[in-house]
């Protein structure tokens, strides 16, 4: 799903959790995917039962309010370990993206690199990835971060931006499925 639909996810998750309160409380919640995970952690009420996750990232962001312009939204980075430390019973498989190690490899292969261009799409996963990379790049003063952001661009403007990148630039591809116009690009 595209990021502009994110405010709807919160209400859907709230409805599911409310449906299974009291006598209907499950013994385990299974969450698959970034969007479902974001919907769950964005809830004020989270039942005190174990959660099993799949296809989610260790890095996350909370969902925006419904009246927010997602193209301009600058969310705060959240490490899922913080939730575990606060007592959330969490298990499963988390993707962990090591931005520092990617930068180290880039510097080893291309020591003259001056710019990192990050491509992200108009999805929750794309914005969560962008938030993580921006956080990690705050500590890397000698490289410039260039954002090729699918929340603000379609595939054609991204291609033009790639053509016009400065010399000594390496591209990191975060994710690309959905552009600003909700155009899907899968398997091409």
Question: Where in this protein do the model-derived segments appear?
Answer:
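Short hydrophobic alpha-helices and adjacent helix-cap/hinge residues
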Residues: 1-188
């Amino acid at each position: 799903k595209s990021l502009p639909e994110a405010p709807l996810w919160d209400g859907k998750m709230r409805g599911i959790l409310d449906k299974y309160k009291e006598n209907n409380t499950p013994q385990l919640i299974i969450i698959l995917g970034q969007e479902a995970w974001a919907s769950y952690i964005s809830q004020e009420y989270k039942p005190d039962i174990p959660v099993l996750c799949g296809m989610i990232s260790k890095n996350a962001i909370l969902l925006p309010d419904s009246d927010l312009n997602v193209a301009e939204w600058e969310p705060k980075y959240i490490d899922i370990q913080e939730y575990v430390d606060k007592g959330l019973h969490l298990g499963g498989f988390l993707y962990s993206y090591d931005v520092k190690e990617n930068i180290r490899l880039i510097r080893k292969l291309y020591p003259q690199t001056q710019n990192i261009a990050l491509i992200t799409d108009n999805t929750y996963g794309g914005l969560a990835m962008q938030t993580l990379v921006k956080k990690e790049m705050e500590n890397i003063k000698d490289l410039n971060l260039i954002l090729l952001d699918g929340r603000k661009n379609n595939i054609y403007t991204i291609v033009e931006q790639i053509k016009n990148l400065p010399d000594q630039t390496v591209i990191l591809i975060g994710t690309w499925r959905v552009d600003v116009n909700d155009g899907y690009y899968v398997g091409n």
